[in-house]
């Protein structure tokens, strides 16, 4: 494929995600799939270049303590956007490689990945045009940390922080790890992003089959929530999400 064809395909992959902050769900999925017991999301603001006092660089970081990646995984999965080691593993929630492309929906100026596994440690820097550079690190690294950097205006911080918080609560509130978000400049410390589905009531029906289950209960208005490993895949009116099951 030519560079232009690859760029067009990458743009289509980015466009498949509903919103610019959906990448947070994809990165939390990767943390789950890496076996991490926690994922820490943080937003920091740094002064921008030049003399403009309102210029800023936003640093949005997702760090986990999972199994990390070695060079073989990086070359065979993360940097080959069409390769996914998860394709045949139904216990995996994400689409490694393809899912990682979602970070570009936030339109970062750069994305930096630090990761380590089996004595290896690596740093990858992805640029806005999807080029990347890879270098080995001398010091060991635990898990994987993905850092997005984007230029903007300092007054955007509160809006970005709220969008991050909303996305995490929307998609990841039931996830099976300890998830936190810290707006560093806000000064309130880390916020735990955690909730639990309501327990089955007297009029609820639970159907468990294999590693999946269906919970049916009364709700006003009727709503459907689709989860996989605690991550919200879709949520909305039952008539839309379960069209094949609802009467005409």
What is the predicted role of each segment?
Residues 1-40, 44-55, 71-79:
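Bergerat-fold GHKL ATPase/HATPase_c domain
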Residues 41-43, 118-128, 202-206, 212-219:
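Broad, structure-driven detector of short, well-ordered beta-strand segments within folded domains
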Residues 55-60, 144:
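Short beta-strand element(s) in the Bergerat
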Residues 64:
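Acidic ATP/Mg2+-coordinating residue in the GHKL
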């Amino acid at each position: 494929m030519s560079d232009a064809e690859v760029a067009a395909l990458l743009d289509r992959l980015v466009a498949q995600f509903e919103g610019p902050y959906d990448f947070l769900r994809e990165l939390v999925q990767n943390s789950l799939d890496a076996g991490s017991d926690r994922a820490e999301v943080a937003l920091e603001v740094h002064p921008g270049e030049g003399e403009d006092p309102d210029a800023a660089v936003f640093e949005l970081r997702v760090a986990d303590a999972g199994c990390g990646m070695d060079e073989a995984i990086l070359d065979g999965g993360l940097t080959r956007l069409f390769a996914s080691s998860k394709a045949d593993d139904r216990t995996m929630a994400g689409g490694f490689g393809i899912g990682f492309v979602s970070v570009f929906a936030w339109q970062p100026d750069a994305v930096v990945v630090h990761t380590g596994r089996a004595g290896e440690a690596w740093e990858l820097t992805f640029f806005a045009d999807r080029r990347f550079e890879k270098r080995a690190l001398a010091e060991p690294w635990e898990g994987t940390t993905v850092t997005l950097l984007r230029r903007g205006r300092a007054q955007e911080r509160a809006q970005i922080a709220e969008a991050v918080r909303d996305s995490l609560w929307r998609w990841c509130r039931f996830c099976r790890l300890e998830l936190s978000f810290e707006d560093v400049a806000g000064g309130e410390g880390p916020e735990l992003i955690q909730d639990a589905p309501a327990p089955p009531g007297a009029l609820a029906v639970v159907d468990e089959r294999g590693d999946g289950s269906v919970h049916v209960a009364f709700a006003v208005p009727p709503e459907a929530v689709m989860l996989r490993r605690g991550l919200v895949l879709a949520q909305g009116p039952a008539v839309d999400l379960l069209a094949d099951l609802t009467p005409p």
